[in-house]
Amino acid sequence: MRKIKKFKIPIYSYEILRKSRKAGADLGSVGLDNDRDFKEYVSQLASAIEPAVVFGYFPTDDPDTAVLSYRDKKPLTIAMLTLGNAIYEKTCDETDEARKTVIITAVSVFAASATKVISDIASQEAIPEGFELSEPFYIYSCPEQTRLSINAGKKDNSSMPLFSIEQEEERNDLNDQEMTLYRDDLTRALFRRLEAGKIGMSLDGNSIMPKYSSIFAFEWIVRKNRQNR
């Protein structure tokens, strides 16, 4: 298990601006339609985040991650990421809808940037072994990223199923509550195994705290040049 606290992430102000406009935020009404003013506001938001992560390697036969198995099961690196409490409190305190939209959009972009940093770090363990990491797939995310559903049938081209087709057929008699229990059991196991409390993450009933947190995994994939040998 590895732990990294208060690591640096790139801040993509233009991406936040583009997505905020796409989300319908009236930036002119709050004086954020100027690129310079918007960038300054995003910098203020970035100063309120405290990225922290724990992550670790899970082999193909790990019993706690059996729920994540695929038709061709692979080893996994699983990470638990939080952006801290302050940025969520900032969202709650904001009364203007346009600014609130910008904050939530910024948090989503910050989290994606942090995930990329984590991927680059975790890859340093995989590459010497002849592997590379897949794109992340999300077990939990707030705000919601491109994310898998607990039901494999709800996948799209940009996310990976939580269960393989065979498993989904075996479990098609389960209701939503029973399916949720699979994810809850996995979440509790990951909190314990990755010692998420060391970065301030906790379970409040079925809620993950701090609110702006995520749990995601990378598959270990054999590198193409190794496959061709």
Describe the residue ranges of each PLM region:
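Active-site helix-to-loop segments that bind/position phosphate- or nucleotide-bearing substrates
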Residues: 1-99, 210-212, 217-218, 227
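Catalytic cores of large soluble enzymes that bind and process phosphate-bearing ligands
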Residues: 30-37, 103-106, 110, 114, ...
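General structural feature for long, well-ordered alpha-helical segments within catalytic domains
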Residues: 37, 41-45, 114, 122, ...
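Conserved mixed alpha/beta catalytic, RNA-binding, or beta-rich assembly cores of soluble enzyme
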Residues: 70-143, 148, 155-156, 162-166
